Amino acid sequence: MRWSRRRFLASTVFGTAVISGRSPVAFGSRTSHKLRQDELRIPITMCHGITDRLTRDRFEQYLDIARELEFTTINYDQLYLWLTGAGSLPDRPLMIDVDHPVASVASEMFPLMQRYGFTGNLFVNTGYFQDVCGGIPLEAGQSACATWDQIRELMTSGWTIGGHTHTHPNLSELSLTDPTGEQVRSEMDTNNALLEQHLGIRPEYFAFTGNSTGTTWSSVADLEAKLRYKLGRLWIIGSNCEIDGKIERYADFVNAPGPNEADGGPPFVSRYITRDTPLFRLPSMELERLLYAPEAFRQYLLGALG
């Protein structure tokens, strides 16, 4: 990934200072500087549905901020065309991702986002439906699993449905126990087959799994993902990730310059999708971590408008 000095400097000051000599307040209206398509920085958030911490009210605060700042949600088809130079995006694009098909995505988040004119993207680990989801418990305040009919309604309403393996294994650990990739291939192929069986689609986009460190990734999983999907997305909850059996600094993994930030996360420049972002190194920012405070979410969006 290549980062120009101008882009790096503009991105790394969004939290508290000014960008290009202007106060962040100036970005709240359409009269501010309009970025060219190749200058866009796309904020991308991720969550696991409504929980005791990420309540419906807190989630609606984020939607209020996004609407106030006049952001438009996009899906992965639009993103892929833009990244490959085959399409354009709205002036202020925003991505709202959800991992795991919990019921609250369909019963609470979906109708709320519809009221705001927003759509999202759901990455489905199909083992969730069979109660073999890598031992992942429901988070506090979460309901059970969404139904296939509910997920189909999301899809027909403009949501992207992506792949997220079958049983949600730690992909980094699999690099040690399954070096040939046999289990990784089975995870992806089972996931794809079930999504095709129940939804009639072959997913084109993939979200790498995560754990308490952040993204779990392996060279084998990356290779297999590239054989099956168009894009691959990571997950940021702090400054580290788990790569090929080892803990690694996220910024080093994605070749982003600069030290970690005061909030405990990677350099600000690594938190957005740009035209320079490799297709299988897309970031996503967990709403329950670095962006949890509404002001942190606001500053994240403002940082895209430099």
Predicted regions and their residues:
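N-terminal secretory signal peptides and thylakoid transit peptides that target proteins
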Residues: 1-16
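C-terminal active-site subregion of NodB/CE4 polysaccharide deacetylases
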Residues: 24-97, 104, 172-173, 178-185, ...
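Short, well-structured secondary-structure segments
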Residues: 43-47, 54, 71-77, 95, ...
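Short, solvent-exposed loop/turn and secondary-structure capping segments
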Residues: 56, 106-110, 133
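Short, glycine/acidic-enriched loop or turn micro-motifs at the edges of active sites
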Residues: 102-103, 167
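Acidic (Asp/Glu)-rich catalytic clusters
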Residues: 111-117, 144-162, 271-277
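Alpha-helix N-cap and loop-to-helix initiation/capping positions
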Residues: 138-142, 146, 178-183
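A structural motif
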Residues: 150-174, 184, 195-198
